[in-house]
């Protein structure tokens, strides 16, 4: 065995000597040239001599340089693939200036200024200023200023100022100032200042200053400073100092000594002996014989024969024949012929000809010509010229000059000088000293001692059984069957089947199937199937299936299946399956399977399996070494 090894070593070194002296070096690369001493001969003045093949060493030096250029050109591709490891600045890399890279200035990159990148200024990027990016200023991005982005200022973005974004100022965004966004100032957004948004200042939004919003300063919102909101200082709100509120000392509150309260001795309370109470003998109570009660024979009750009840024959009831009821023939009912009803011919109804209705010609209706309606010419309407409307010139409207509006000069508005407004000095406003305001001691506010608040025992409160309350069976309440309530079947309610409600099937609601709602199937809602909603299937929503939403299946949404969304399956979303999203399967997303994403399986992504990505299955240095060694062996055999 030792003899065999000795002979093998002898033959090997003999081969090296012969090859070094007489062998070919024309086809060898830079490494073989170093091994076999070509530079040694050149350094020692032997460049003018000829080798055994009749070639000058000077010619060999030129051939060697050509081989080095060839090897460098072949290695350049590998170097471009290994720039994520070496920190160079080629395109589609991590930390360079090329397009579709991570941490550079190219498009579709991560942390650079290109589009569709992560942390740069390009569009569709993550953390940059491009559109459809994450954390930048481009559209459809995450954390930037572009549209449809996440955390930026573009539209349809997340956390920026663009529309349909998340956390920005654009419309339909999440957390920004645009409309239909999440956390911004746009309309129909989440956490911003736009109307019908979540957490912003728009109307029918969540957490903003618009009316009928959640957590903002608009009226009928949740956690904001508008009236009829949850967690603000507006009327019919949760956690404020207004009347009919929850947690204050006003009348008709929950947990206080006022009338229509919960757990006190006043009338219209819950668990006491007063009228309109829950479990007592007063009127408007729950489980008693008084009027406006739940399960009793009084008027305005739930499941009894009184007026304004739910499932009884009284007026203003739900599913009975009384006025102002839901599904009966009374006035102010839902689906009956009475006034103020839903789908009947009475006033203040939904889809009828009465006033305060939805889709009829009465006042205070939705889509009719009456006052306090939605899309009509009456006051307190949405999209009409009446007062207290949305997008009209009436008072209490959104985007008009009437009182109680959003962005106008009327009272009860958002951003105007009228009373009951947001950011003005009038009563029922947000941030002023008037009643029904946010941060003041006026009535109809959230977190104060006035009536019509949330956290007290009065009507229009949260957690009681009075009318216009949250969590009771009265009208305009949250969690009951009355109109304009939360979780009931009335119009403009939260969690019911009425329009402009939260969690119901009406339009502009939260968690229902209506448009502009939160968590329902309507458009511009939060968590529903409507467009421009949050968590629903509509467009421009948050967490739903609509477009421009957050967490839904719509386009430009956050966490849904729509395009330009955050965490959904749509394009330009964050954490969903759409394109240009963050953490989803769409293209130009962050952490999803789409192209130009961060941490997904798409192309131009960061940390995914796609091409031009960071953390993908690219060729490493070990692969390059294997290629070089394989090439050396081939050249050695060629030289022999």
UniProtKB/Swiss-Prot annotation:
Localization per Swiss-Prot or TrEMBL: Parasitophorous vacuole
Intrachain S-S bonds: none
Keywords, comma-separated and alphabetical: Malaria, Repeat, Signal
GO cellular component: symbiont-containing vacuole
Compositional bias per record (Basic and acidic residues), positions renumbered to this chain: 47-59, 94-623
Residue stretches of each Sequence repeat: 90-97, 98-105, 106-113, 114-121, 122-129, 130-137, 138-145, 146-153, 154-161, 162-169, 170-177, 178-185, 186-193, 194-201, 202-209, 210-217, 218-225, 226-233, 234-241, 242-249, 250-257, 258-265, 266-273, 274-281, 282-289, 290-297, 298-305, 306-313, 314-321, 322-329, 330-337, 338-345, 346-353, 354-361, 362-369, 370-377, 378-385, 386-393, 394-401, 402-409, 410-417, 418-425, 426-433, 434-441, 442-449, 450-457, 458-465, 466-473, 474-481, 482-489, 490-497, 498-505, 506-513, 514-521, 522-529, 530-537, 538-545, 546-553, 554-561, 562-569, 570-577, 578-585, 586-593, 594-601, 602-609, 610-617
Record's compositionally biased regions (Acidic residues): 60-79
Origin superkingdom: Eukaryota
Residue ranges, annotated region (Disordered): 47-640
Predominant place of localization: other
Signal peptide: 1-23
Region entry 66 X 8 AA approximate tandem repeats of G-P-N-S-D-G-D-K, spans: 90-617
Function in brief: S antigens are soluble heat-stable proteins present in the sera of some infected individuals.
Name listed for the protein in its UniProt record: S-antigen protein
